[in-house]
Amino acid sequence: MLTGDESLKKRPMKPILNSLETLGISTESDDGKPPITIKGKINGSEINIDGGISSQFISALLIIGPRLENGLTLNVNGNLVSKPYVDLTLAIMKEFGVETNTEIPYEKYSVEHQIYKPTTFTIPSDFSNLALLLAANVLLDDGLEIDINLGEMPQGDEAIIDILEELGVTVILDGDNITTKSPKVLGGGRFDLSNTPDLLPALAILCLKSSKPIEIFNVKHARYKETDRISVISRELKKIGIGVKENDDGMILTPTKNHTPAEFNSENDHRLFMAFSIASMYIGDCTVTDPDSVQVSYPNFIKDMKNCGAQIIPL
């Protein structure tokens, strides 16, 4: 049986459960959500899966493919979201000695029965979390110099650099350090996050310093994360005075000069807690719920923010 914390129990898993059942596995779940019971032995070699909800399903199936007796042919139906994460999966599999045949990019893959081989692998800095630190740097007057290890793995969330530059920020990469030089007021723009949904929280809070609307679109799959991030971000930013038009696949954020201190409800979502905490540091006198959620991805977040001068007081 597989389960998780309360936020993970909200995540829809039906696409991958349906695929596993195609391979002969029996599954039981709470309407496609954890806890999930898995029984049986895989006896198939070709499956179809919906690519429109999460690329994580495709990554998981690709990773098990080499260990199946007859290998695996994977057909991705619909428009695959978060494509760079599939590229990253394939690159890491190759590092460990597994070759994958990309028959049609982002639509059809096949992998023969193979054995993963031990290797030495340096994990690069995670741009999903780095994006939040860069957003903090922009909002808090560029006081941070962040040590990083970029590595050579493809990371879609590296797009945060292009996004910041479109908003008027200069991003400075100097060896293993990254910092920013920001204008007093940011610009606005339209941003397609179809391949980078984890950038949504970082981009959304940058509207606190913008002078023009920020439109975020093609990120409907962010509704299927630990929370419905489009809905929660829209609701919470309204509390501080941001004009929000929530769309099915994103939002339009209209900035204000006067921000109202508020209590942010992060709904136990680690990325939202971090984003709302950074927004609170900019506004002042705010409260953010669920600090323990950062244990999922960035356990030292609060400590690091305090080291940067943030006044964070547990309640």
Segments predicted by a language model, with ranges:
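Short, structured segments at the rim of ligand-binding sites
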Residues: 1-315
